[in-house]
């Protein structure tokens, strides 16, 4: 009871009004990369393209990059080694996938090759990027990717090139 009145059956007013309008993206030119800019870079390697290669083709690519001891390695390990060696020489890596946002706020770009299931070659998308670009689960995102640092397990999205096959607009 408040002020001697019975509030039974009455709806409480919300403490604050929630703004249901879509937020405008607030990203800068440093957050995006054009597809032409990516493709113009020397020695661009594409993660989706590597996923389609056979194991023998991957081993040939690895040998040409002087990566050794991959004779009995799994496909994912060979791909991971190729990408890591490629990035060590400061060459760009192109990644693409369908975004799945987890409850913690971050997300992963999943591949149709793995039926959109979690895998070691998924690309991590930070909560900050998800907010900046107003991304949602199911969006197709592509861009430049960096290899995992020492304490990380996944490749990470550096810059966004396209969202749902269109360049992001500010």
Language-model regions: role of each:
Residues 135, 148-170:
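P-loop NTP-binding catalytic core
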Residues 1-125, 134:
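Charged, low-complexity terminal tails
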Residues 138-140:
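Loop/turn positions that initiate beta-strands
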Residues 102, 146-148:
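Short beta-strand micro-motifs enriched in acidic
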Residues 131:
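Conserved small-residue-rich
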